[in-house]
């Protein structure tokens, strides 16, 4: 693709089937995204677990099947009970990539700032692998002190 992208990820299914079909038919690989869809979070009532009732879970399974039928090469499954993540994974032959969808999905993804501990609030499904907030704060304080005390920039950080 001209911009250097290798695929697009589209959130949601319902009402967008023709768009997805057209994009896939145009030769652009599409990854679907179901469950919690951050771009529509306000329509979903905020950052809340999706698929908690049997009816909601069944709907998510149907959405995953529709995405597969439309030609999506994979589907992100976000913020659903682990049992629902497993059901979706069993229901489709395309890879499922979980983010807060339990251990049974085919792959996993985390938001980098959650993984690195940059934000003070971490979603329940994320694990911090470092205290990035402290490291960033320390680096910013050191930078400010170096500028204030004329230790930055030096000739080494300047063009001649």
List PLM regions with ranges:
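Alpha/beta enzyme core
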Residues: 1-130, 134-160
């Amino acid at each position: 693709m001209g911009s250097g992208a290798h695929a697009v990820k589209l959130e949601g299914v319902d009402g967008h089937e023709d768009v997805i079909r057209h994009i896939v038919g145009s030769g652009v690989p599409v990854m679907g995204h179901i469950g919690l869809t951050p771009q529509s979070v306000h329509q979903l009532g905020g950052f809340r677990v999706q698929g908690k009732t049997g009816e909601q879970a069944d709907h998510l399974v149907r959405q995953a099947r529709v995405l597969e039928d439309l030609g999506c090469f994979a589907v992100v499954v976000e913020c659903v009970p682990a049992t629902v993540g497993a059901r979706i994974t069993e229901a489709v032959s395309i890879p499922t990539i979980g983010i807060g969808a339990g251990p049974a999905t085919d792959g996993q993804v985390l938001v980098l700032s959650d993984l690195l501990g940059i934000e003070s609030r971490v979603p329940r499904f994320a694990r911090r692998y470092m205290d990035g907030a402290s490291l960033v704060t320390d680096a910013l304080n050191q930078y400010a002190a170096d500028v204030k005390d004329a230790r930055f920039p030096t000739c080494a950080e300047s063009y001649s």
